[in-house]
Amino acid sequence: VYWIMIIPLLILAYYAIYIHKLKFLRSPLLSKLSLGTAILFILYIGYIQVANNALMEQPESWTAYFAQRGGTFLNSSHQTFLPRYLHFIVSSVAIGGLLFALVFHFRKETVEKREESIRRGLRIFALATAVQVVVGCWYLLTLPREFILQFMGRNALATLFLLAGAVCGTGAMVTAWSGQFKTTILLTLATLAAMIITRYQLRIMYLNDHFSVSELTLNPQYGVMALFLIILVAGLVVIGYMLKVGFNKTERSAA
């Protein structure tokens, strides 16, 4: 029940955001209510997604899940859940600020407005990243002691990528606060890559006593892969065409 609600609530959240935009000037109250509703729905979706991801890594909790097959089991009582959830939400705010700056970097505005908007987006990114550092440390300290030790030097690969992510993330925060847009983008991409690998390392640690990747049998399905690539390329072509048409209309309207 709770899980399947993600899909309709995501659709409703998109509708609410459109209402917020369309009614921003004509009906400020409705616009604010729509924005608040969209935020609540998105927070709920994040809550369910984080609960599901946590459940995936904790086979010892699966018995409770199988006892409630209707989708009413929420794996949110684990000690890592709250910092994990906040880690997810705060990082979304940070990337949102960076996306805001990226949009205005390419938007045709006056130089003053464009630079001010980029600076504002970078400040949002920097502040959210500062909070993310605190939340990340909290999350790390809630992990089992053996996992912490692996990230603190016992596992060289895990330690290397965690350290790389922390250094690049801190660097991105500093460059964002000082208004260095392109450097911030590059450091953020490096941070994301390092943290994705770190996340994978943590998942392996959780599942190590229950499952090993080396136990899997590899059965390549080249036909399915080829079909996926064809559809991917076709989709990118369609999206590229849509963007081209949209930008051409915008330029004609501006002219």
Predicted features by range, described:
Residues 1-255:
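Polytopic transmembrane helical bundles with strong interfacial aromatic enrichment
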